[in-house]
Amino acid sequence: MKQIAIMKNKIYRKIHYIFWHRLHPGRWSLYLFSSYRHYKLHGKKKNIEELPESIENLYLTQMPNPGAGIGHQMGNWNAGYWYAKLFGVEYAYSSFSDPSWDSFLGFGEGEISAEQLLKKGYKKRILPYFDEKSQKDVQLIREIIQSYGGKKIVFFTGLDQFYEKQFGVMEEIRNKFNNAKARKEEVSIYEKNCLNIAVHIRRGDIVIGQENQDPSLTKRWLTTEYYARILKDIVKELEKGYSYKIYLFSQGTEQDFPELKDIPNLVYCLDMPPRESFLHMVRADVLITSKSSFSYKPALLSDGIRICPANFWHGYPEGKEWILVDEENGLTEGQLSSLCEQVQQTKKKYGEMHEYN
């Protein structure tokens, strides 16, 4: 029975994706949502800021896509948290498909869940899809929410409602992660007496994408040469006086990465369990990400230096600790200089545990 339910869910998500994201139905599709029909019947109300008492029982959430990986699901979660803040209502927690990630991330600690609210008699209402960059769309969603003022409602955004920047909730999720109960049991293979550099190279499914030229997968591809060039440039600078180790998080075997065989102090962490890999990317002094939400999300939680591909579908915050690399040209002299300056600051963080000349 469980397998049948999983299959039905996959079929539903596929049809849902094709209808909303491939066919792009017009404005008429708004009437498919009861929340929009309610808004049309009850008309525009006062600004929600003028009626604070009316929004006390309004919540918003986004369900993590159960068919996606944890990086994608975190993107869904972040979107729900962000849109609740944007529209001035309370956030209702939605669990990840694997409960072990709930306890690992700790995002639900101190939050009331959508499931709890529905059991208390709150009504579920699904919001229409909207373009977050369209003021007209955002205002419409705001007015739909306002039309329910005074009622007990949990609003659900559409499946995979997009939120591009993601870093708008960076401080909140970092605080949640660092204060989660699971942090008390945190175990790391990193050495305290050297600079720890984590590299995530996405392979697995996108290798197949290279073979069949699936555009949804080829756009996620970065060659191993891209990483080798970055690492060689970094090593050249670090060998001037820093003790360091490089940890590679990916899938496969060492033989799958011949371009990296000459990189010194390289530790292969291939096929490490997902949560352990995720944690080590978060805790790295320097994190080199891929075109993958699985390393982008740890970058949002990290306090370290992040080196990221500039061409990515989620945004990056401004700041010297975010070094955005051109895929063709690699690190510039200015970026290498900035990296070295920031690495030097680790001396203040770790005292004399790093070996400096």
Predicted regions and their residues:
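Secretory-pathway luminal glycosyltransferase catalytic domains
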Residues: 11-20, 27-59, 99-242, 339-357
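A short, glycine/small-residue-rich beta-strand->loop->alpha-helix junction that serves as a flexible
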Residues: 65-75
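Histidine-anchored nucleotide/phosphate-binding helix
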Residues: 74-86, 227-235
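Donor-binding and catalytic core of enzymes assembling or modifying cell-surface/extracellular glycoconjugates
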Residues: 70, 235-310, 315-316, 321-325
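Short, solvent-exposed loop/turn segments at secondary-structure junctions
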Residues: 67-68, 96-101, 159-162, 202-206, ...
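Soluble, non-transmembrane catalytic domains of enzymes that act on hydrophobic metabolites at membranes
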Residues: 1-3
